[in-house]
């Protein structure tokens, strides 16, 4: 409640509330996202909401249907969070619940793609290398738009953690660029009238000169 009251007061009293709120955030924590911030983070983490928002804003498409994610096409096309590397396949190679660290990596948000509901129902547990190869053939730009590494070696299950490392870097870089653009503010310079200059008086940058022209009439 105290932080909320402070933020509301900032909005009400500041001539530039957006910049003022950004300053408050910057003082409390860094605005930069690092690849390590994604490690072991599941879809409940705020970074996933930010990723989803960013992907929709840049025109990302469903990997299976090619439909733009930001279009509302009815209940069958509601957006869902799909494992790129199916959990059933990861579990077979040691990423099950018996190993908490590995399990967290299997559920990491960087192992998620945004698909429409109808696409998610048909994908099942296809190996990532087969699925992503098919996606690249049908929709060449789809992987890039969802910040998915393009190196096919990373799609093999034995290279799963290399895939995570690479996608963390891609997401961190692109989200930072995105945040920088939406948080950048331009300083507005108000025009100064001649009357204001005269009222201000002379200074190091302004000197009044007397004129040699006289109206003798």
Describe these PLM feature segments.
Residues 1-84, 89:
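Intrinsically disordered, low-complexity N-proximal targeting/linker segments that flank membranes
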Residues 110-112, 127, 143, 203-204:
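Short glycine-/polar-rich loops that comprise or flank the Walker A/P-loop
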Residues 83-88, 120, 210-212:
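Short, flexible loop/turn elements at secondary-structure junctions
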Residues 79, 91-121:
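Short beta-strand-alpha-helix junction that forms the catalytic/metal-binding core
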Residues 117-185:
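Long, cytosolic, alpha-helical-rich C-terminal regions that act as interaction/scaffolding modules
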Residues 184-217:
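Conserved N-terminal catalytic/coupling substructures associated with nucleotide/phosphate chemistry
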Residues 44, 74-78, 105-109, 164, ...:
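Active-site-proximal structural scaffolding
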Residues 70-72, 103-107, 196-199:
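A general structural signal for short secondary-structure junctions and capping/turn motifs
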């Amino acid at each position: 409640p105290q932080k909320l009251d402070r933020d509301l007061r900032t909005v009400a009293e500041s001539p530039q509330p957006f910049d003022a709120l950004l300053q408050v955030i910057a003082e409390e924590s860094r605005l930069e996202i690092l690849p390590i911030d994604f490690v072991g983070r599941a879809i409940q983490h705020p970074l996933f909401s930010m990723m989803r928002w960013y992907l929709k804003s840049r025109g990302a498409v469903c990997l299976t249907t090619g439909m733009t994610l930001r279009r509302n096409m009815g209940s069958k096309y509601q957006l869902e969070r799909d494992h790129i590397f199916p959990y059933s396949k990861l579990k077979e190679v040691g990423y099950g619940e018996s190993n908490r660290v590995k399990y967290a990596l299997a559920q990491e948000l960087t192992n998620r793609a945004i698909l429409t509901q109808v696409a998610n129902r048909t994908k099942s547990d296809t190996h990532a290398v087969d699925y992503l190869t098919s996606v690249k053939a049908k929709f060449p730009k789809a992987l890039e738009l969802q910040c998915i590494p393009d190196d096919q070696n990373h799609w093999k299950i034995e290279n799963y953690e290399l895939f995570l490392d690479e996608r963390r870097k891609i997401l961190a870089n692109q989200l930072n660029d995105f945040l920088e653009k939406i948080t950048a503010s331009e300083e507005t310079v108000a025009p100064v009238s001649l009357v204001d200059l005269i009222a201000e008086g002379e200074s190091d940058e302004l000197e009044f000169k007397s004129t040699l022209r006289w109206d003798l009439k």
